[in-house]
């Protein structure tokens, strides 16, 4: 499929909207009430610090809703305002936040069901409204919705669209796209759908394996087994790694994306000589500003003397997971929760350790004065951060009283 021609035609369709419906002021009031927090604003104005009894909270200087997420949520609210009586669907979670997705359900916005790992778009009627989430949607999904004559409301983050543009540039030069991301993540599924040839690498270890294969060859069957589900149909590592372009899932670790890009650059220079680099390697900066800012902000917190970190965000949120990863790498006890309800008591917290299932841990909140570093992922509203702060303070007060 000519994906560039398809998306160009789709955007000209009268059934396509990515600008909203003129209800911005009304929606802003609703979102202020639902997601903003006076307490959080006060903490920002107090050098991102709150002192309550034995608890000192140190907030990262950038956290929570990013511009792309806020835009996506606002467009969903606008869509319900504009189509008060029509059936509205979301093709996936709007964002990776359980409370916001519940708000969508409370507005009688339904989610396209997933059956045996596949989205069942047959439930959407020809005149239904379908919202594409902040992560975007695959070309194939958009084609289905266009063919069904659905009203498409596209809330894809512009940073994600920027990555798609890079993929189109790779494709124009017949390069294979090397995508730094998680092959099962909604954004990476959407991004890879724009490529003719692609390979998804999760981390530096996988990137090093690929680069070693480029330089020295290897066992083709082993390669394909190692990257099962992470490459395009018909991909051949012996033929399709001679010209590569770098792209990324926007929520991956900035430093790792940069290191992977440099590794492939060095590899192609070594394989084909420096003067031939441009014929074999492309890299465009597609690291999301919001992701970078939140990672830089938590790094700034590490200069403080912290007893522990609490990281708030959906358990399936990639950008939140990477914030958690940074805290752990800096040797700080860290707890990833998706809301204040996970703080069960002064002694118990339900959280998701890095790379593991949700569990309950004991002894998470130290005795005596405690300094808690706190941040949240790009899909987490300020109100969820306030609720968590209040719960932590309340747990300490129980002991003091």
Curated annotation (Swiss-Prot):
| Transmembrane segments annotated in the record for this chain | none
Q: Which InterPro entries match?
A: LytB/IspH
Q: How is the cofactor bound?
A: Binds 1 [4Fe-4S] cluster per subunit.
Q: Which UniProt keywords apply?
A: 4Fe-4S, Iron, Iron-sulfur, Isoprene biosynthesis, Metal-binding, Oxidoreductase
Q: Which cofactor does it need?
A: [4Fe-4S] cluster
Name the Gene Ontology biological process terms.
dimethylallyl diphosphate biosynthetic process; isopentenyl diphosphate biosynthetic process, methylerythritol 4-phosphate pathway; terpenoid biosynthetic process
Residues bound to (2E)-4-hydroxy-3-methylbut-2-enyl diphosphate are 96, 185, 250, 317-319, 379
Catalytic residues in the record: 187 (proton donor)
Which CDD domains does its entry note? Answer: lytB_ispH (cd13944)
This protein's pathway reads: Isoprenoid biosynthesis; dimethylallyl diphosphate biosynthesis; dimethylallyl diphosphate from (2E)-4-hydroxy-3-methylbutenyl diphosphate: step 1/1; Isoprenoid biosynthesis; isopentenyl diphosphate biosynthesis via DXP pathway; isopentenyl diphosphate from 1-deoxy-D-xylulose 5-phosphate: step 6/6
- Reactions mediated catalytically: isopentenyl diphosphate + 2 oxidized [2Fe-2S]-[ferredoxin] + H2O = (2E)-4-hydroxy-3-methylbut-2-enyl diphosphate + 2 reduced [2Fe-2S]-[ferredoxin] + 2 H(+); dimethylallyl diphosphate + 2 oxidized [2Fe-2S]-[ferredoxin] + H2O = (2E)-4-hydroxy-3-methylbut-2-enyl diphosphate + 2 reduced [2Fe-2S]-[ferredoxin] + 2 H(+)
MF terms per GO, please? 4 iron, 4 sulfur cluster binding; 4-hydroxy-3-methylbut-2-enyl diphosphate reductase activity; metal ion binding
Q: Top-level EC class, please?
A: oxidoreductase
Matching NCBIfam families: ispH_lytB, PRK13371.1
PANTHER family per record = 4-HYDROXY-3-METHYLBUT-2-ENYL DIPHOSPHATE REDUCTASE, CHLOROPLASTIC
**Family designation:** Belongs to the IspH family.
Q: What is this protein called?
A: 4-hydroxy-3-methylbut-2-enyl diphosphate reductase
Q: Which organism is it from?
A: Trichodesmium erythraeum (strain IMS101)
